[in-house]
Structure formats: structure tokens, C-alpha cells
Amino acid sequence: MTDFDTKKLNKKWTIEDSISTYGIDKWGEKYFSINSEGNISISPDNKSQKKIDLFKLVKEFKSREINTPLIIRFNDILKDRIAELNNAFSQAIETYDYKNIYKGVFPIKCNQQRNVLEKIIEYGDRWNFGLEVGSKSELLIGLSILENQKSLLICNGYKDKKYIETAILARKLGKHPIIVIEQRDEVKRIIEAVKDLKATPILGIRSKLSSKSSGRWSKSVGDNSKFGLSIPEIMLTIKELKEANLINEMMLLHFHVGSQISDISVIKDALQEASQIFVELSKLGAPMKYIDVGGGLGIDFDGTKMSSNTSTNYSLQNYANDVIATVKDSCEVNNIQHPIIISESGRAIISHCSVLIFNILGTSHVSSQVKVSDQKKQSLIITNLIETLNQIKNLRDKKEDLSEIIELWNDAKKFKEDCLVAFRLGFICLEERAYAEELTWACAKEIANQLENNEIIHPDLSEITDTLASTYYANLSVFKSIPDTWAINQVFPIIPIHRHLEEPFCKGHFADLTCDSDGKLNNFIDNGKIKSLLNLHPPEKNNDYLIGIFMAGAYQEALGNFHNLFGNTNVIHIDINEDNSYKIKNIIKENSKSEILELLDYSSDNLVESIRVNTESAINNKTLTIQEARKLIDQIETSLRKSSYLSE
């Protein structure tokens, strides 16, 4: 019997069981589902019949020597997300008879990859979709790839004089940059730049709202927020712009109430406050034309549609309706022309289109099999543990309440602690300690088997599940590919991409390749709650066990680092054809070890030469043969050209 044989597969396991276990029917929306073969299926929208089998896709990539870990970017999903956002605002504008338009922008910081931004511009062109930049580097990207002169380029972030001058001069190229004043000292720089260049900008102002936010980033807004002007600072800025004859260039109000806002009431409150500020700025003589509602449009990571860190209590259409209706009401009450609505919705656009796939390298787990000790005379601790295990087994066919099981489990834990103390003092040997641990695990497994049908586990017994959990070793760096799970405990949908016709009877979590205890994935979505273990299958010999992390297209690639020198993974951009085939549009190859070392100023040639010199010394000292030296150098040179991740 193998370590995973403690429970036989349930032959009646169905796809519906897998759907219920992983909740993919909730968080998967129209994009992700399980097909009749038990594999994850990708659909770009609900209007066409296009579908692609994710597991088969990854296997085909492997045949092309494009190995895991890898990111697959589905261009069709990105296209659909952009259309969904723009259509939602179009519908709201029609419903509320709004007398202006919506012009969205994508915040480059969410995903700066060139292939991503080019697709966003391509797919958004029909709506004059623009970009938002937050640094001089991002400004250069925006100016170089945004060709549509009707598209907006919102200029946020800290701005020195060069940033401001670049944005002002870009207007002469036919671009449409709007410089958003976020710090008081930017006003002086803008005035100086206008005088020096004898050119005028389009200006906006970012307000710090008093409205409270919700979710993980709720503390990033308000009086102590990093960006924006207080109301007194806004009044002073308006005064200075009037004195500099620049008030006629002030056309935009911007605000931001945090990312991934979970509660729609927060958005409504912020909109009401901001709309009134917009009205007042108009009354002060600024020809206000735009209101930028910032980011914050959340996505539903767990599918519960509730206000939480992993969900939202509103839909995309709810959001658009509230933005349009609130701004309209404030303007009409004050006889102000309806402004152009701008939003900076990054996460909602880019998250769904990227799927991160990794393979499992191996597992470790607690064995419930007890090996008979060779010790002729057993210590009292061992005897007590054997007796406890037998007492637990004797409860199998009895209907006592849980109190007896709890008592016996506490006894087993106490005997194990006694064993550790005895070992420290030298009273028992290493073999006896190993035997005691095996007996304790066997007690835990026996209790787990007896309680497997209990829907609610007593708190005193809940630790047993963690005790018996398996660790699945992932060919992945958490710090490189999915850093938000480590940095802010963000929870993403994680699910095997195949074998959904089999029962995932193992409970486990993931450990990554890095030599860091934080390199793990142990928070998983569970119907609105977070659980520490995921239902998984036992890996099969000679077959990859493939896991997908979904809805992780925002921020992760930009925030990832080279911890332990694990580099970028392969990234493949694909289009799904009408016949359910696919076309690879772009392949961004993973970093080789040589490329990673070069980033840290290590020359691969120098590295090889240094080792070669060492081999010469070893040959002279007769500790290494010439053949061994050649083999070592060959392996090092080959390794430098290969991936930093593990391969077969």
C-alpha cells in the first residue's frame, strides 16, 4: 500500500463534484469551466462557441519545448474585458440619458508589458481608450505607443520639471496628455514650464476625499493619503492658476478611493463628494470638462458577490450605473454641463486574461503506516502511544460522542511531547522517537478516517487536518510569479487544470523553489472563506500534475523579484480561433541563468573562466581528471543557457 493509498478513489466522483469543490462556476464567470474530459476549458466570451482545453494546450507547448512554469495570456479575454467595461458605460449613459461620453484609460502600472499594452490600445481604439501613467518612464511608453489623438493620456505621479515639460510638448505631437496636479509644489513647476516653453498644458487636479474606503487599501485614502490635495490646497491652487492666467487650462478633477473596492456604497459616497467638488470648481471659473473617477473597480475572486477582500457586492454594470447617475444628478442640480467620464480600471481589465501554470515536482506527507520497532524493550511512552492508537481504533463501530476521541487525541499529543522531552534528556534513542511520531500520526489518521463524513469538525480536532496535510513542491517562485500572495496575503483562485473526473482526496498546500519559509501558497478560496488546504490529487508517476493560478494578470509580473535568482517564466500570448484551434501571437522566452546573472553584473564568461582555472589546479593536484574537468565545464556552460527553473 502506498502513502496515498489510505483512501481509495471514489469511482462516482463527477465533474459536478469538482465544480462544487473548487467553486469554478462562481469565480470562473464566462471564461473558465471544466469540460467533459475533466480539464479546465477557456472561453473568451459568452457570445461565441470558442473554447480551448487548457491542459491539452500546455501539453502542446511542452512538445514545443515551452515548459512550465509559464503564463498563458488569452488575448480574446482581454478584448472581451475592454468591451465589457465600455459597453457597461454605454448602457448606463443610454439608461440615464447622460449628455456626454465615457473615455477609459488603462493604468500602465498594472501591467507594463509591451505586448499587453499594444493589445489594449488595439482593442480599445474604437472607444478611444487611453492610458494612465505614473512616472517618467511610463510617460515615455505612453507617448510612444498611443497613436490615437482622441485617446487621453492621464499623467499622474510625482512630477519634476522634465516630466511636466515632456507632457506639455507632447501636445504639439497631437497627443492628448492631461497633467494632474497631485502635489502642491507641482503648481510652481507647471507655471515655470509654461513660461519657458510658451505652450499651454491641459491640467487636472487630484482631490483627497474625506469619504471612507473599504477593502485592503482602505487606509490609502483620506487626509493622510499619499497623493492629492486637500480642499484648502485646492483653493490655493485655483488662486495661483488664476494669477498665472492658467485657470482656463484646468479641466479635470481626479480622485481615487483605493484599489479593489469591495463595497458599492463606498463608491457612491466618494462619487457624491467628488461630484460636488467638480461643481464648485466650475463655479470658481475653471472650464471643467472631465471627471476621472480613478481606479477601484473590483473583481470577484471567489464568486460570492459579497463585500470582502476577495469579492465585491456589485457588478460592472452596477458600477457604471452609479458613476453616471451620481455625476449627472450633481451637475443637473447645479445647471452644470455633464463632463466626460474617465476611469482608471486596471485590475478589472487585465486580471482574467492571464493564467499561471506550474507543475508539481514532488510531495511530502505524513505516513499513517507504523513500522514495527526493532527495540526488544519499549519505553513506557511508546507503550502508551500504542495503547492510545488501539483505543481509538476500538471506537470505529461505536457511537460515543466526540469527547472520548478528543480525550484520546489529547493523550496522544501529550505522549508525543513526553517523548520529545525524553529524547532531549537522552532517555530514548532516535529510533524510538521516530516510532513515537509514526504512532502519533497513525492516531491522527485513524481519527480523520472516523470523522471524514462529519460536516463540522470540533475545534479541538481541527489541527488533525493540518497534521496530515501534504506539501506539494511547486516548480515556481512565489516571489517572482505571484508576489501578492506573500506581500499582502492576496488570495487567487488555484485549481488543478486536469483530472477533474477523479476525486482530489488529498489535502495539501504548495511550497515553492526558493530557500525561504515564506515561499508557499497556503491560502485558498472556499465559498467566501479562506482555507489553508486545497483538495488535490496524488501525483502520477511519469505524468505532470499541473496547477493553474487564475485572475493574476494585474501587478504580479511588475512586482516580481529575483529572489534566489529565479527569473521570468515563459509567457505565451494566444488567440483562439473559431474552430477552437489557437494561434500563438507572441512568445516571451524565460530568463536563462546567464541572463539573470548578467542583470546582477556577473559575466558568464568570467564565471566559466574562473571555474576553469579551478579545474586546472585540481587536475595538477590530481583530485580531478581531465575528463571530469571537461564534463564539469560542459555542464556549467549548458546550465547557463538553460532556465532557472527545474526541468526533467
UniProtKB/Swiss-Prot annotation:
Write out the transmembrane intervals.
none
The record's InterPro entries line, in alphabetical order, gives: Ala_racemase/Decarboxylase_C (IPR009006), Arg_decarb_HB (IPR040634), Arg_decarbox_C (IPR041128), Arg_decrbxlase (IPR002985), De-COase2_CS (IPR022657), De-COase2_N (IPR022644), De-COase2_pyr-phos_BS (IPR022653), Orn/DAP/Arg_de-COase (IPR000183)
N6-(pyridoxal phosphate)lysine sites (modified residues): 109
Biological process according to GO? arginine catabolic process; spermidine biosynthetic process
An example Gene Ontology molecular-function term: metal ion binding
Chain positions recorded as substrate binding sites: 291-301
Class in the EC hierarchy, top level: lyase
Give the protein's cofactors.
Mg(2+); pyridoxal 5'-phosphate
What EC identifiers does the entry list?
4.1.1.19
For this UniProt record, the keywords arranged alphabetically read as follows:
Decarboxylase, Lyase, Magnesium, Metal-binding, Polyamine biosynthesis, Pyridoxal phosphate, Spermidine biosynthesis
Q: Which reaction does it catalyse?
A: L-arginine + H(+) = agmatine + CO2
Say which family it is in: Belongs to the Orn/Lys/Arg decarboxylase class-II family. SpeA subfamily.
Q: What does this protein do?
A: Catalyzes the biosynthesis of agmatine from arginine.
What protein am I looking at?
Biosynthetic arginine decarboxylase
